[in-house]
Design a protein with these regions (language model features):
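Acidic, low-complexity proline/glycine-rich segments
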Residues: 2-12
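N-terminal core-binding DNA-recognition domain of tyrosine recombinases/integrases
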Residues: 2-4, 17-32, 38, 42-119
Length: 119
């Protein structure tokens, strides 16, 4: 298990605000859609914890790289037996969260390019 980081705590706060306030205030009033966003992020965090040993408070921008997300989709398909439509729905929900996160914290918008420009 990784230690809590400032970045992890910040991302955790954004997740909490996104599912508890932002979705219902700015995206939809549908309880089913709100539940889908919440469940998607819960599944993603569960995947990171179970398969990568990353807790919610130790999240970083690396946790949202293309390769990690692709591995999560494979986990949904193979380990959780999700059909293609479900995987696509989960990916769409995660994509909306990442756009929200990128609008709040520019460092999370394009993590690979931020690393290159700092190096």
């Amino acid at each position: 298990m990784k230690k809590s980081t400032n970045q992890g705590v910040c991302i955790a706060r954004h997740i909490s605000f996104f599912v508890n306030d932002y979705v219902s205030s700015f995206l939809t009033e549908s309880e089913h859609t709100i539940k889908a966003y919440r469940y998607t992020l819960t599944l993603y965090i569960m995947y990171l914890d179970e398969k990568r040993g990353i807790t919610i408070n130790s999240l970083s921008s690396d946790c949202f790289s293309r390769s990690v997300i692709e591995e999560w989709i494979l986990w949904l398909k193979n380990d959780r037996n999700c059909c293609a439509a479900t995987c696509n729905n989960r990916l769409a929900c995660l994509r909306v969260f990442l756009k929200y996160l990128g609008s709040k914290e520019i460092d999370y918008l394009y993590p690979e390019s931020v690393k290159l420009s700092n190096g």
